């Protein structure tokens, strides 16, 4: 068993320094994202099904024509390749779970040398 206290993990650079909590090929990837007040994750998509959990604060999420204001405890789910954006006025802490990891067509890159 592994466990994490999501409120105690430091994310000093906000969205520029997400913290990968767990990543296992064929399974899932869990990432903690801290957003500072006014930060935004612009329109993007991922190859995996994604679940986004608001751990602290509040965010506004747009996906296509839908817009949701999501507060503490809200869980949002996105299909693979579904475009979406996330923004916060007051700051937020989010848990992102991607599964299966990596998704079909996910860019693998090459190892650093």
Show where each model-derived region lies:
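A short, N-terminal "cap"/entry segment at the start of jelly-roll beta-barrel domains
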Residues: 1-29, 62, 110-113
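A cytosolic small-molecule/anion-sensing beta-strand core signal
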Residues: 55-56, 71-72, 90
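Conserved short histidine dyad/triad with adjacent acidic residue
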Residues: 15, 29-46
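Structural motif
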Residues: 58-60, 67, 83, 93
